[in-house]
Structures are given as structure tokens and as C-alpha cells.
Amino acid sequence: MKFQSILSTATSTLAVGAAFLAVPAFAQSTGAVDFEEGAIVVTGQTQNGVAGVKLPNTSKAKQVLTQEIIQTQVPGQTINDVINLMPGVSFQNNDAFGSGGGTLTIRGFDDSRISQTVDGIPLNDTGGYALYSNQQIDPEIIEQVNVNLGTTDVDSPTAAASGSTVNIRTRNPFDDFGVRFLGSAGDFGFFRMFGEIDTGVLNSSGTKAFFSASKAVNNTVYGGIGEIDKTQFNAKIYQPIGDNGDFISVAGHWNRNRNNFFGSTPLRTDPTRVVGPDSSNRFPLTKKERFYKIADCQIPAGVTGVADPASSCGSLYDFRYNPSDTGNIRINSRFTLSDKLTLNVDPSIQYTKANGGGTVDAREFGYERGVAAPISGYIGGKPYFNGVDLNGDGDTQDTVRILAPSNTETWRIGVIASLRYDINDFNRVRVAYSYDRGRHRQTGETSLLKSNGFGSDVFSDNALADADGNILQKRDRLSYAILHQVSGEYTGDFMNDRVHLNLGVRAPFFKRNLTNNCL
């Protein structure tokens, strides 16, 4: 039985990790993990206070970080910031705490050209292939992360990766019962709690599981008006089959972000201007000016019988929410069919709902130009409600600022299946099939702002309708991204293991179906 409780503080951290170990080369899918042979040696050593990582001696350019290094970083930090330790990897974090997003590049390729997976399932957005680091899995349950520099595994289910592959592997449940709690606190109101429970082995067949949860909040580092709020749950059940390494594991993940953006300032230095993110502001010139404060605001009440103009309250980027709900269920499995034949099957399902916020000046009245009678609709980038009192002042003459996010809801299913055949002790082949199907529903409903300028309904689920009950939205489309891929791989050892040869071929077949319901 294990109990562990840790309290740590965090503002900004320079972490130095050292590890001397030999680990298996965990790749993307269970089949890729099973196919790779031998040990990759990863060494970390301290040199002038900077952690060093050596390239593994393999046929592919790879770098690996394990929990020994990951656990030395800031608690709750996104794994994309942790792999910043690797040569060739560059990650620019939006804040010091890991929940505010960032930008990843590897050897010059941006995140739309980098494939990132967790336990074999792809994390790139199926629309534009972007990565969102604020939605990454908690680092405490990551066993290791390996980065293929400039290569992908042949069964990689991606239509975009031409740069590198970042493969995240979560740990398996421990054999013994255990409980762990970690707490962190720091500047900008940062506070995070993480807890996990391992059941230990539950029965004679070896079933075991773990469950974890975390909550992290902090104030936005610029502007002083927004907040970062992240909640995450993870679970994994592992069932060994026999004593030859066969198994089935089922893992689940849910992540909820309710974050505000923090905007950038104009690249102007006019001394007559005030520091801030508005177009009339300027860039900070001193360290003290970096921590500018955005003033609170109130939307004025409408006046009956007057054509009220839209308030500017809530228009700044810093008032925007960047909400997201993401989850997945993933299965990994290995089945030995004979002494030479092994089957791996990894199915998964994912869900995402997110938007980038934004507001628009809505018209309570109808659109009149070039028509016989006023009409409603989203026209010229503006919603015309044609007779709806949005601000409650008893008339329909006003222009009112409302929330107008661009929502994307995605359901994604996938499977990676591979069959490995061991020709002899020195040669093996593998054939694989990968399927990935993403359903994207993209809409642009509107909803009201609260009196302080922030959105009252971050996804606009209670969407505003015109006088005839029609939902007004700036976009309304449905698309499917469908990938079928077949691949094959050969690996062989020659000259008493002095030469290792790896050959692979992949043939992806990708199509996208789009239905646009907007006129």
C-alpha cells in the first residue's frame, strides 16, 4: 500500500533532469511498440545547469523522455513544454503554468505538420491539423514521450504529418494499491490539485486500474482581467491475457477548459498613448509597464425610443473565452496467434467542442437595402434580427454587442490494426491498416453578453433567434475527413547485430466531404 502527498510552489521554473536508463522504444500504436526490437538508451546529464539529452542509436532519429525527467518539471505543465528540453524541439508557452496554450515547432515544421498521439490515437485537429497544448493529458500519468525527428511510423493515421511525430504513452496501473496527491501554488493566483488512485491487482486474472483528476486555475498573465480554468479526469483499466505479454487496456480521458485569452499590444511606442491591447494603445517600454491592467466595464442599459449604439464593453480580445470540452476512449490490445504471428488492434473514439470566442454588433431591426421589406439574416458579417429586443429596453431600434463564437463540434473514430510475422530471430515483417474518420459540425450561433462584457453562454447553446424563430449564425456546415491507409514494414538485423535495417511503405487514401448550408 502506497500513500504519497506532495506540496510544491511554482512561479517560473528552470528544471534540470538527469536520467540514466534503458527503455523500450514505445512508438505510436501498440503494433508499432510491439514491432520495434531492442533497447533505446536515453541519457540525461547536467552540464552547466542545463539538462542534456542524447540521441538514441537507432535507425530513426529519436529522442525519449521518461517520467524521471517529466516529474522534475512544473506540476501540470503541458508535455509540449517538457519536450522543449530536446534538441530540435521549440515550444513557446503562452504562460508559465501550461494551461494557456502555446506554439510548437520541430526542426522548422509547425504543429500542423507534426503528428502528435497519445497511446496511438491522433491528437491533431482533423480540420486544420493544429495542436492545442492546453488540452494535453496530465504529465503525472505519462510514462514516456518520444519524438521522431522528421519521420513517422508507417501506421501513423495522419494525412498531414511531414515533419515529426510526438508519441505520448500513458503509464499502466500499478500492481499495488496506492494514493497520491499533489498541490501547487504560485504567482498570478495559480493553484493546482492533482490526485490519483491505483487499485492494485484486483483478482487472479491480474485486472488493475487507476483513476486520476486534476484542477488548475490562474489569472491571465497580462491584462489582469481574465482567468485560466482547467479540469481533467483520466482512467485506465489493464487486463493481461496469459503470461506471454498479451493484454487489453481501456483508457478514458476528459478535459474541460474555460480560458480567457490575453491579447497582444500594438507595436507602437507613441508616448501620448497608454499601454494596453486596444488599437489606440501602445507597446510597453519598461518591465513595469508589461503588467498593465484592463479596466472593468459595464454595458449601459438601453433607453426606450432611442437608437442606442453598441457598447465597446466586451470588445477587447481579453474578454473572449476560449472554451473547450475534449474527451476520448482508447483501447490498446495485443494477441499472440502463434509462435510467429501477433495481432494488435487499437480502436478509439474522440469528442471535441470548442471555439475562439468573439463578439459582433447585432441589429435589432431588419436589413433594408435593396429589398422590398426588412429581412432578417446574417448579412455582411452582421446579424439582423428584424424585430427582436435584444437589450430589453422595449424597442427594436438598437445596435447591441453580443457573443458570436465560431463553434466546432467533432466526433472522431479510428482504428489501427496490424499483423506481425517473425520470419526468424533476425527478420520480421508487419502489415497494418489505419482508419480515421472525423465528423465536424461547424456553426456560428450568437448569445447575449453579461453586463460586465463577458459571455454568459460560452458555446451559445441558448442561441438567439430572429422574430420568426430562426437561429441566426455566421456559418453552418458539416464536413467529414476520412482516411484509409495500408502500410507495410520490414526490419532485419545483419552482421551480428552491427547493421539494423528498417524499411516501410505507406499508402494513405484521404478525402473530405463538405456540406455548406449557408447561402
Task: Label the predicted regions.
Residues 36-74, 103, 111, 146-147:
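N-terminal periplasmic "start-of-domain" segments of outer-membrane beta-barrel proteins
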Residues 38, 102, 162-164, 177, ...:
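Hydrophobic, lipid-facing positions within transmembrane beta-strands of outer-membrane proteins
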Residues 136-180:
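A beta-strand signature from Gram-negative outer-membrane beta-barrel systems
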Residues 164-201, 211-225:
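Short strand-turn segments of transmembrane beta-barrel domains in outer membranes
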Residues 183-189, 199, 215-219, 241-243, ...:
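Transmembrane beta-strands of outer-membrane beta-barrel pores
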Residues 220, 238-240, 245-330, 355-408, ...:
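Acidic/polar loop-and-plug regions of large Gram-negative outer-membrane beta-barrel proteins
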Residues 325-355, 386-519:
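Face-selective signature of the C-terminal outer-membrane beta-barrel domain
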